[in-house]
């Protein structure tokens, strides 16, 4: 995110007070809110998988993958102070795109490469599980975005 181009309305905003730290109460509130939403969703997802008779390693792998995907999607909540960060300006940040592709590649490696399965205790996921993971991650991202607006945690 360090390579993010400036937002168009940046100069219209009031400047931050020199006494304020970069991690102020509002920003800390967003971090805590996001952590709670993603954490509760992960807990619910794991519980759902266990209750539907999936093996422990499978449920752990799916939950681990959900958390990785949710964090990748959460980038779109933090790219901009207001609104959603998936717009045309996203494609101007090549390092961020590279980091997302690399992160997804590493996650796929952790899930599907046999030596990584052995090393990390993961197991390959079925295609349908990926659909549920992306749905849950998308919903948690939308919930965080909605709560951010509701509490005006810009």
Feature-to-residue mapping (PLM):
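C-terminal transmembrane helices and immediately adjacent loops/tails
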Residues: 1-154
């Amino acid at each position: 995110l360090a390579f993010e181009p400036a937002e168009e309305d940046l100069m219209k905003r009031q400047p931050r007070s020199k006494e304020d730290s970069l991690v102020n109460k509002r920003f800390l509130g967003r971090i805590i809110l996001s952590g709670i939403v993603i954490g509760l969703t992960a807990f619910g997802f794991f519980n759902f998988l266990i209750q539907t008779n999936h093996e422990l390693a499978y449920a752990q792998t799916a939950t681990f993958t959900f958390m990785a995907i949710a964090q990748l999607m959460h980038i779109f909540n933090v790219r901009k102070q207001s609104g959603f960060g998936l717009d045309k300006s996203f494609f101007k940040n090549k390092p961020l795109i590279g980091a997302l592709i690399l992160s997804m590649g590493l996650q796929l490696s952790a899930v599907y490469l046999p030596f990584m399965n052995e090393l990390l205790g993961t197991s390959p996921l079925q295609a349908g599980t990926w659909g549920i993971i992306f749905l849950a991650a998308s919903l948690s991202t939308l919930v965080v975005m909605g709560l951010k607006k509701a509490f005006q945690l810009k």
